[in-house]
Amino acid sequence: MIYYNKSELINYLTSLKITTTYKKECGIKIAYNEVVASFDIETTSTEVRGDKFAFMYEWTFGIEDFICYGRNWSEFLELCETLQQHFNTDSGNRIVIYVHNLSYEFQFMYKLFNWESVFAVNLRKPIKCLTTLGLEFRCSYILSGLNLALTAKNLTMYKIEKMVGDLDYSLVRTPLTPLSDVELRYCEYDVKIVICYIREQIHEYKTITKIPLTNTGRVRQYVRNNCLYSRKSHKKTNRSKYHNYRELMENLTLTPKTYKLCKLVFQGGFTHANYDKVGEILENVHSIDFTSSYPAVMLSEKYPMSTPKEIDDVSRETMEARFKKKNFCYMFFAKFTNITSKRNECYLSESKCFNKVKPVVNNGRIYTAESLLTAITNVDYEIIKACYTFESVEFSNVYEMYCEYLPKPIITSILDLYEKKTTLKGVAGMESEYLKSKGMINAVYGMSVTDIVQEEHTLVNYNWVTKESDTDEKINDYNTSKNRFLFYPWGIFVTAYARRNLWSGILAIGDDYIYSDTDSIKFLNYEAHKDYIEHYNNYITFKLKEMCDYYNLPYTAISPKTNKGISKPLGVWDYEGKYKYFKTLGAKRYMYYDDDLHITIAGLSKSQGVDYIKSQCESVKGMFDFFNTNMSIPASGTGKKTHTYIDDYKEYEITDYLGNTSLIKSESSIHLSECEFTLSLSQEYERFLSMFVDGYILGGTTYE
């Protein structure tokens, strides 16, 4: 890596033989130069008389094999202008520059460029930004879905590792601070890794124009092509296939009203703890999890295949009879009166309930209420009946949809990805295909719940602006889109079916149940529950075979074999292992010990949190005692950073760690500071647990 020199850059660019490919965006033909480039910065965060101040002290840029670095923004701006002049780039002729976690670099440099367009997934979360110079910055982090170290580890054509520990971020550095060869190598490799990663993406997609923006976009592209097109060219070579699928989509439409109901009905995975076990140190705890839970229900269950139709007769008797009908599903509002949990676990999410009267809440879940209103599916209703008692229920805004298996191209896409994930693991020479299929099978569900009406976030006059989308307009665009291959209600039922499957385990395991998280359960007395596990596994396999029969698919597709000949059936409970000790303090808060300590605590680094707890305790028991509702970890031991966005120009005299003082100017920045972590329970949850301990909550009854 060399220090940036304009003439050396020009000499290198002149030596390149670059082709151009074209892509249409909003009907306009855009030229892209087939060249790989990446950019990264190193920054310092400090405080001056209590004022947070952050700035860039080193940047690294790579284009193919040319890697250079600089120490101030003026050098980088000159480099960008040199690229523009050499390639004659503009909004219609572009060069893509990948940045790993673009949102971070963007905050430091957004005032330095004139922006043609900024596409962001959220406020301050840009993933594609086009300058008037024709330089298009893209985020490689949201494409890979992995941090830089894991991105490097997963490379299959290149052998390169992220340097770790070679750059001490606690030291104050400025553009005048000397950097050692080791420190510069750290900076160089961060850019080289991204270049290697994008080269592998180009090898896969053949051109930079075909690389999706996001990891979810990758699987979306793959499944869409299988649904709408034939052959690898993805041209409409089979007109009947394209038109048949388009006809299906034209019959699967929403209105603004049904879309809003879908939004209310949608819930994610179920994560919670048995309140009877919270705070206890439990021994010999077992863990089971579903193999590919969401893909399994996408294959085994039936989904809405008609436009939602409102029905009038909504008495309880009529509705419960409707729920028993085959090949129909429902979404609706339900008002429950005098509803109380009859289990040590609670299903209804407080955030999904409205008009609550005298609710008692168990860590975000409804334990009891005099009355409440919620929007649910018929699948949710059956779970509620199994785990709550209620005096009455009133239904309203009920919509009925005919159900059938998902279209065959979606089914075969999922099966193909699962087969590759299973059969290619550990096969020499197939690492890239294995990693791709593994990432895509995990993203299949995500594409099914992508929101139709999203806020638009962009930069206007260097200010972030959020624009509300017009629901009617977006729904109309959705209904008439010729590229659409999904139906939003499908995703709603994916999670509903997955929750039902999880709750089959919670209910069957009963008092031995401890904790669940989306697709896994922790519990006691494994031997006592083996019959349930075996029965469930036979049941889900039977359902998957029914789907195979329907589409004339081989049974081997739902249970492919590894390269060692071991069958890996889809959707079954898989035994994860036994923990010597386990303790939970609520959702996303648990600790277990097998031969080492492990923690999952929302907001706390797993590795650094474990290291700190170990450093404070002399025994395993001490570690579990330390993990309590008053646990506090100092800033130096959490691995957490507080991000402070600074949009104002600042300049200060800064003295670096070597004693060198210089005037530093910063147009905008992100200040990072270590922050402490304190584990605490909400007052409402503490009160609920106290009521249970004191006997006010017992056997499905709340005593005043």
Regions found by a protein language model. Give the residues of each.
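Conserved DEDDh/DEDDy metal-dependent 3′-5′ exonuclease domain
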Residues: I63-R173, R185-Y189, I193
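Short active-site loop/helix that positions an aromatic residue
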Residues: F106-N114, L148, R199, T291-S306, ...
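N-terminal accessory regions of nucleic-acid-interacting proteins
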Residues: M1-A37, I41
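Short hydrophobic beta-strand that contains or immediately precedes a catalytic carboxylate
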Residues: A37-D40, F137, V285-I288, Y294
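Electropositive, glycine- and tryptophan-enriched low-complexity nucleic-acid-binding patches
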Residues: F55-S74, E473-K482
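C-terminal, non-catalytic extensions of nucleic-acid polymerases
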Residues: I198, I202-V278, P304-K309, T340-I514, ...
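Catalytic palm active-site di-aspartate
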Residues: Y189-D190, S287-S292, I441, D512-N525
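Short acidic, Gly/Ser-rich segments with clustered Asp/Glu that frequently serve as metal-coordination loops
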Residues: I41-R49, F290-A296, S520
